[in-house]
Design a protein with these regions (language model features):
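Generic structural "secondary-structure junction" signal
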Residues: 7, 12-16, 99, 106-109, ...
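A short, terminal or domain-edge coil/loop segment
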Residues: 16, 88-98, 122-132
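Short charge-dense sequence patches
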Residues: 1-9, 70-76, 102-104, 127-133
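An N-terminal, well-structured beta->alpha segment
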Residues: 1-58, 62-63, 137-153
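Short, surface-exposed, polar/charged, turn-prone segments marking secondary-structure boundaries
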Residues: 27, 31-33, 67-70, 96, ...
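Gly/Ser/Thr-enriched, mixed-charge loops and adjacent short helices
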Residues: 21, 102-153
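Alpha-helix termini
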Residues: 21-25, 55, 77, 84, ...
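Ferredoxin-reductase
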Residues: 35-109
Protein backbone atom coordinates (compact mmCIF):
# COMPACT_ATOMS: atom_id res chain seq x y z
CA UNK A 1 0.00 0.00 0.00
CA UNK A 2 1.44 3.38 -0.94
CA UNK A 3 1.04 6.49 1.22
CA UNK A 4 -2.12 8.56 0.68
CA UNK A 5 -2.11 12.33 0.42
CA UNK A 6 -5.06 14.59 1.23
CA UNK A 7 -7.09 16.00 4.11
CA UNK A 8 -4.24 18.18 5.39
CA UNK A 9 -1.44 15.71 4.93
CA UNK A 10 0.20 12.41 4.14
CA UNK A 11 -0.71 9.09 5.76
CA UNK A 12 0.60 5.58 5.27
CA UNK A 13 2.23 2.48 6.64
CA UNK A 14 5.42 3.32 8.51
CA UNK A 15 7.28 0.92 6.22
CA UNK A 16 6.17 3.00 3.21
CA UNK A 17 7.14 6.36 4.73
CA UNK A 18 10.82 6.06 3.91
CA UNK A 19 13.25 8.99 3.73
CA UNK A 20 12.75 9.44 -0.04
CA UNK A 21 8.94 9.61 0.24
CA UNK A 22 9.21 12.05 3.14
CA UNK A 23 11.77 14.17 1.26
CA UNK A 24 9.60 14.32 -1.85
CA UNK A 25 6.54 15.56 0.05
CA UNK A 26 8.45 18.02 2.24
CA UNK A 27 10.24 19.51 -0.77
CA UNK A 28 6.98 19.69 -2.74
CA UNK A 29 5.33 21.45 0.22
CA UNK A 30 8.20 23.93 0.47
CA UNK A 31 7.95 24.70 -3.26
CA UNK A 32 4.16 24.77 -3.60
CA UNK A 33 3.00 26.55 -0.46
CA UNK A 34 3.86 29.87 1.18
CA UNK A 35 6.30 28.49 3.73
CA UNK A 36 8.56 31.51 4.07
CA UNK A 37 12.10 30.71 5.17
CA UNK A 38 11.24 28.78 8.34
CA UNK A 39 9.27 25.60 9.01
CA UNK A 40 8.41 24.46 12.53
CA UNK A 41 8.47 20.70 13.11
CA UNK A 42 6.93 18.58 15.85
CA UNK A 43 6.02 14.97 16.47
CA UNK A 44 3.71 12.75 18.44
CA UNK A 45 4.81 9.92 20.74
CA UNK A 46 4.62 7.03 18.25
CA UNK A 47 7.82 5.00 18.13
CA UNK A 48 8.20 5.70 14.40
CA UNK A 49 7.88 9.48 14.73
CA UNK A 50 11.47 10.44 15.69
CA UNK A 51 12.94 8.83 12.55
CA UNK A 52 10.31 10.40 10.30
CA UNK A 53 10.81 13.77 12.00
CA UNK A 54 14.55 13.59 11.35
CA UNK A 55 13.87 12.99 7.65
CA UNK A 56 11.55 16.03 7.65
CA UNK A 57 14.18 18.23 9.34
CA UNK A 58 16.94 17.01 7.03
CA UNK A 59 14.86 17.84 3.96
CA UNK A 60 13.87 21.29 5.26
CA UNK A 61 17.55 22.08 5.74
CA UNK A 62 18.52 20.52 2.41
CA UNK A 63 16.15 22.89 0.58
CA UNK A 64 17.80 25.85 2.32
CA UNK A 65 15.17 26.63 4.95
CA UNK A 66 15.38 26.93 8.72
CA UNK A 67 13.95 23.99 10.69
CA UNK A 68 12.69 24.71 14.19
CA UNK A 69 12.53 21.42 16.11
CA UNK A 70 9.87 21.47 18.83
CA UNK A 71 10.25 17.78 19.69
CA UNK A 72 7.25 15.86 21.03
CA UNK A 73 4.18 18.00 21.65
CA UNK A 74 0.43 18.08 20.88
CA UNK A 75 -0.49 19.02 17.32
CA UNK A 76 -2.41 22.15 18.42
CA UNK A 77 0.70 23.39 20.29
CA UNK A 78 2.77 23.21 17.11
CA UNK A 79 0.01 24.89 15.11
CA UNK A 80 -0.24 27.70 17.68
CA UNK A 81 3.54 28.25 17.67
CA UNK A 82 3.86 28.37 13.90
CA UNK A 83 0.79 30.52 13.27
CA UNK A 84 1.83 32.95 16.03
CA UNK A 85 5.30 33.21 14.46
CA UNK A 86 3.86 33.57 10.95
CA UNK A 87 5.62 30.41 9.77
CA UNK A 88 4.66 27.08 8.25
CA UNK A 89 4.81 23.77 10.12
CA UNK A 90 4.94 20.03 9.62
CA UNK A 91 3.63 17.74 12.36
CA UNK A 92 4.65 14.08 12.34
CA UNK A 93 1.56 12.35 13.67
CA UNK A 94 -0.53 9.30 13.06
CA UNK A 95 -3.39 10.91 14.97
CA UNK A 96 -6.15 8.32 15.25
CA UNK A 97 -4.89 5.79 12.68
CA UNK A 98 -3.45 2.37 13.69
CA UNK A 99 0.03 2.16 15.25
CA UNK A 100 1.62 0.59 12.16
CA UNK A 101 0.93 3.85 10.29
CA UNK A 102 2.04 7.44 10.62
CA UNK A 103 1.83 10.66 8.71
CA UNK A 104 2.59 14.33 8.17
CA UNK A 105 0.22 17.25 8.73
CA UNK A 106 1.13 20.41 6.83
CA UNK A 107 0.44 23.97 7.98
CA UNK A 108 0.95 27.25 6.14
CA UNK A 109 1.34 30.48 8.15
CA UNK A 110 -2.46 30.95 8.25
CA UNK A 111 -3.27 27.38 9.41
CA UNK A 112 -3.83 23.91 7.97
CA UNK A 113 -3.33 23.49 4.25
CA UNK A 114 -6.49 23.60 2.15
CA UNK A 115 -7.56 21.85 -1.06
CA UNK A 116 -5.81 24.46 -3.23
CA UNK A 117 -2.57 23.85 -1.31
CA UNK A 118 -3.02 20.07 -1.63
CA UNK A 119 -3.42 20.40 -5.40
CA UNK A 120 -0.29 22.57 -5.62
CA UNK A 121 1.71 20.02 -3.61
CA UNK A 122 0.58 17.17 -5.88
CA UNK A 123 1.62 19.22 -8.94
CA UNK A 124 4.99 19.98 -7.34
CA UNK A 125 5.51 16.26 -6.70
CA UNK A 126 5.28 15.66 -10.46
CA UNK A 127 7.98 18.23 -11.29
CA UNK A 128 11.69 17.41 -11.14
CA UNK A 129 13.02 18.12 -7.64
CA UNK A 130 15.69 20.81 -7.41
CA UNK A 131 18.88 20.05 -5.52
CA UNK A 132 20.86 23.29 -5.70
CA UNK A 133 20.27 24.87 -2.30
CA UNK A 134 22.46 26.22 0.47
CA UNK A 135 21.92 24.13 3.63
CA UNK A 136 19.45 25.69 6.04
CA UNK A 137 19.65 26.29 9.78
CA UNK A 138 18.55 23.99 12.62
CA UNK A 139 17.04 25.36 15.86
CA UNK A 140 15.86 23.21 18.76
CA UNK A 141 13.31 24.60 21.23
CA UNK A 142 10.69 23.57 23.74
CA UNK A 143 9.03 26.98 23.99
CA UNK A 144 5.92 25.96 22.01
CA UNK A 145 4.89 23.36 24.55
CA UNK A 146 5.45 25.77 27.45
CA UNK A 147 3.45 28.51 25.69
CA UNK A 148 0.62 26.07 24.96
CA UNK A 149 0.49 24.87 28.58
CA UNK A 150 0.55 28.44 29.91
CA UNK A 151 -2.24 29.47 27.54
CA UNK A 152 -4.61 26.70 28.57
CA UNK A 153 -3.80 26.13 32.24
Amino acid sequence: MSPKFGTSGLRGLVSDLNDKVIANYVQAFSEACPTGDTIHVGRDLRSSSPKIMQAVINTIREVGLTAIDHGALPTPALALASITAGHSAIMVTGSHIPADRNGLKFYVPSGEINKTDETAIVKALKRPQSSSFQRGIYIETSSALNTFITRYI
